[in-house]
């Protein structure tokens, strides 16, 4: 049992370290992306015009200067076509908070790591809990094999005890046991007593 807990702790620390490493890599990529685009920018989307292809221009300027003449550099057209070209461009002033984005991603990855750790914990510990809490399964099977008129008398006591436990695993086990009892009762009524299912 001690080696199992030691293994779980090592697995948990390994998962935490991998989640932390993933967070650091993601933050590094976000900081690289932040170098390309600041938190405040003006973005102009210009469609194709004559022989010039469409293009997207980004520039870190104030909101009052967010127009085609200040953002589009170098200007792809000359002379009188500049005004016609700029009328086609759609410029938007954008603000974002990269700190909020980073914090949100860290929280998301932390929750994901905790859920993964919890899943591994349940996967490894569930068989031990089943053996300890529901070791009475052989008793129910032996009563059923004998053909007693009340084969589930002990099962009702066990189910009543499991009902008092408040964790999710016991509630699921209780629902499974209750369903199995109903199925067995229906089988008994159909095959032994030849009664149609209700």
From Swiss-Prot:
Membrane topology: Single-pass membrane protein
GO CC list: early endosome membrane; lysosomal membrane
Pfam families: Tmemb_9
Modified residues (Phosphoserine): 142, 189
InterPro entries: TMEM9/TMEM9B
Location of this chain's protein in the cell: Lysosome membrane; Early endosome membrane
GO BP terms: positive regulation of canonical NF-kappaB signal transduction
Signal sequence coordinates: 1-33
Assigned protein family: Belongs to the TMEM9 family.
Physiological role: Enhances production of pro-inflammatory cytokines induced by TNF, IL1B, and TLR ligands. Has a role in TNF activation of both the NF-kappaB and MAPK pathways.
Record protein name field: Transmembrane protein 9B
Gene symbol of the encoding locus: TMEM9B
